[in-house]
């Protein structure tokens, strides 16, 4: 079962600040969601252990040796033979897992807008302050947290953060009523937030809006944006998984030979435990003998586990954005509007979890002079040289760059002749020139344009018919050719 209770309260006010000509708006919002999730008839590994550890009474019956478990009704279990497990035994080793979660948010804000006059010059301004407090927790029961419910460990997640932010926006008219400059306006904005978890962050914006005449407008904005880590990014517990990852060193020293990459071969041989296995062989427990090279049996592969979770040391990610656009609204047909925008977005210190398989590959494919590198910290090995574990925690390590163009054409047919109502059409086309991802400063980067999820060309055409209360919409979407990354030549070994 899954029971969810949600409450939301919001209060707001707006008005004039006396006779100053300034206006204000203020609000307070509170929201809370509680969830109780209960599953049924899951395996109780702890009770199963107690049930197996049984002894025989003088009368031939059995009892659980653990006195505490016995006091709580432990039922000895017989796992041998068809039908040997009775309903009483079954009921002792099953239970109903429970998980409780809560998300709570308080937000209060005050904003004001108006004009500022300095002599003969007037410009517009807006300013505000915001206070936000958020907290959340997710608490699996004790067996789930210990991994004794027949599955992986599911840790508790408990965290909170609060922030106080303030912003100022200014709009300056520069030129108006001149040839080729019907209006020129400059806008600037600044915002600073102080987080209880990561400290202070700032965001800025600078833009120009140049109205040439009634038909043509040019616009451009340069800004810096910030995204703070979420509670989950910061406080998510380390979850266990038994998903294996490929070892670049596997097969070296065997008849198959393993990797042919010179960097991989050199780096693997520089790790003492791996080099020993490559030279002297590795023990195969399934066969009970030593086999050549660093060979992986099914048992070796199944023993690899991973840990995935948050990181209280993660910081904010920042983005530098640049846009430049042209708007055409022809006077001969006011129902037509055409906009063309070019954009470039660079995001640094991206909050992300790098794939463990990618990390270990980049660890060993690096030039020997830079080995071991930061990627190598995300895995450990047994003394035999085989992989033991991998980790993937939230970090600030990645870089994204998006660059492209958007074209939008809108037209409205007000008069459909004998057909009542109106018809609006909208065509939006996107050309993606660059979608670069770089895991960290040591990574040369990969351009994913043309791969699944990042087509070079996309388009969406919409027809919207309205007639009083009747609304009919028809959409069609075009996605350009894409390829699977397994067959796409990145030059990085995929």
What do the predicted segments below correspond to?
Residues 1-164, 179, 223-316, 339-406, ...:
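Surface-exposed, low-complexity loop segments enriched in small/polar and acidic residues
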Residues 7-11, 104-112, 164-170, 202-208, ...:
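Hydrophobic, lipid-facing positions within transmembrane beta-strands of outer-membrane proteins
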Residues 10-16, 113-115, 167-173, 207-211, ...:
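Transmembrane beta-barrel domains of outer membrane proteins
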Residues 17, 28-36, 129-137, 174, ...:
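Transmembrane beta-strands of outer-membrane beta-barrel pores
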Residues 18-20, 117-120, 163, 175-181, ...:
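Outer-membrane beta-barrel channels and translocator barrels
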Residues 22-26, 118, 123-127, 182-188, ...:
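Transmembrane beta-strands of outer-membrane beta-barrel proteins
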Residues 160, 193-202, 318-320, 409:
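Solvent-exposed loop/turn segments connecting transmembrane beta-strands
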Residues 241, 423-494:
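C-terminal beta-barrel architecture of Gram-negative outer-membrane proteins
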